[in-house]
């Protein structure tokens, strides 16, 4: 990964840390790791059996990223809900898990960057491990 040119302002150290955290928590069920901003995205990890080329993967993932970028506009609403003084104290937003027929998409947002993980069907408890590790990396950046 060293020396790779990114479409976002992502550095090699953070990219490596994100992939390592996801691989450690999710193992071979991990399909892809995408880092994104409101205007661009990078593929950090792609399991070998999924696409013929990186260009094919970018084309396939572009619509997913565009959909998940909407999460940036949700931040003020999520913050207001979390901090609203009422009996429904749900706490701060942490991450989103989308359930699909044959797998999952996990979205982690921190300020103006996000990470998407696509995963085969598995035990959902591992999502929290991966999301918390990635939150820590993004928060410290």
Regions found by a protein language model. Give the residues of each.
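Non-catalytic interaction/Regulatory regions outside core domains
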Residues: 1-141
